[in-house]
Amino acid sequence: MKAKHTDLEKLEQLYKESGNQLVVLYGRRGCQKEELIKEFCDGKKFFYYRCRQASPEHQLEMMGEEISRQYKVSLSRQTYEEYFARIKSGGPSKLVVIIDEAQFVAKRDTSFMEAVAKLKKHKLYPGPVLIILATSSTVWATQEAAEQFKGAEMKLESLNFLEVVRHFESLPVAEIVRIYGAIGGVPAYLDKWDAAKSFKDNICRLVLTPSGALYGEADAV
C-alpha cells in the first residue's frame, strides 16, 4: 500500500520550508511509517539509521559504522555531535536525516537528543536539514519527545472509510463495511486482506488461526 497522500504532503511541505525543521513521526503498529519514509525520501539526499534495542555504547558504535559506510569518512570521535557534523548532502539541496525507532537511543543516552537539538540549530551541519525522529512508541512521542520539541509531533492515522473503499475498489460497499468493522483502517492489516477471498475465509486465515498474520494482534497493540 502506498503512503497516504496527506501524510506525504505534510512531509513535503516541511521539506520545502526554508531553514531547518524537525518532526517526530509516530503511529500505532501497522501504520507503515517505514513505507512513508521510503516514498518521501525518493529522489532526495538522506541519511537513514534504524536504532536497535542496544546499550548506549553499542548504539553509538553502530550509528558510527553507518556514518562511515555511507559517507566514506574516518571518524575522529564516537559522539553524536561528531556524527551529525560529518553528514552531507553533497550539494545545496536539503538533507533529510531519519532516525527510526529513535526512542531506543533517546531513552538511554541523553547526548543523542542534545546533539539533535544542536543539529536543528545549525550548530553541527551547516546546510539545510529536515530531521525525522520516527517511532512506534506513542508514549515517547507524545510525552518525552514532545516535551523537548513542542509542536513537532506528526501522528500517522489509520485510513478512514472512504480511503478503505478506494483501496478495495473492486469490492461492493457492503463488503467493505464488514471489512472496516472487523480490522479498521490500519494499512498493514488491509494489505494482508485478500480481496479475492470471502470475508469468512479472510477472518479464519488472518485472525482466528494461530499462525495467522493478525492472530493476537489486538493484545499486542
Which residues does each PLM region occupy?
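Phosphate-binding site recognition
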Residues: 1-221
